[in-house]
């Protein structure tokens, strides 16, 4: 009887863990005190031969992916100032990669994707 009880408890835990790990449905809405809206500007930015990036106009900053030499200018509007001189670098995880926010540019690094079908 003891072995059967342990087996049932193990099966219950496995079922509970697999159900919670596999749930990709919508969750309850979460509220954040910091609201940010990202908008692309009308201009692009490019990496110069010296490795520096061309400046974007106004409140816009340069965003590029990985080692690309061409990027887009982007603006963040909201309650939180990502381009503040007080914070020269912040890391923020995005859904598909790591987004590094600097004063002058933002880099999005995407991890290698698994191309095999599940």
Swiss-Prot record:
Molecular function terms from GO: C-X-C chemokine binding
Cysteine disulfide links = 41-60, 45-62, 56-73
Coiled-coil annotated spans: none
In terms of superkingdom, the source organism counts as Eukaryota
Q: Where in the cell is it found?
A: Secreted
So which residues have sugars stuck on them?
44, 67, 104
Q: Which keywords describe this protein according to UniProt?
A: Disulfide bond, Glycoprotein, Secreted, Signal
Q: Which GO terms describe its cellular component?
A: extracellular region
Task: Give the function comment from the record.
Answer: Salivary chemokine-binding protein which binds to host chemokines CXCL1, CXCL2, CXCL3, CXCL4, CXCL5, CXCL6, CXCL10, CXCL11 and CXCL13.
Name this protein carries in UniProt: Evasin P1080
Which organism is this entry from? Ixodes ricinus (Common tick)
Lineage, opening ranks: Eukaryota, Metazoa, Ecdysozoa, Arthropoda, Chelicerata
């Amino acid at each position: 009887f003891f072995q059967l009880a342990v087996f049932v408890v193990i099966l219950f835990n496995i079922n509970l863990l697999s159900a919670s790990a596999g749930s990709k449905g919508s969750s309850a809405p979460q509220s954040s005190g910091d609201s940010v809206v990202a908008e692309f500007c009308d201009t692009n930015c490019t990496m110069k031969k010296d490795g520096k990036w061309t400046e974007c106009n106004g409140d816009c900053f340069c965003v590029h992916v990985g080692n690309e030499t061409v990027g887009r200018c982007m603006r963040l509007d909201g309650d939180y100032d990502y381009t503040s001189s007080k914070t020269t670098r912040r890391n923020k995880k995005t859904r598909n990669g790591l987004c590094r926010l600097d004063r002058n540019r933002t880099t999005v690094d995407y991890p290698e994707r698994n191309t095999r079908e599940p």
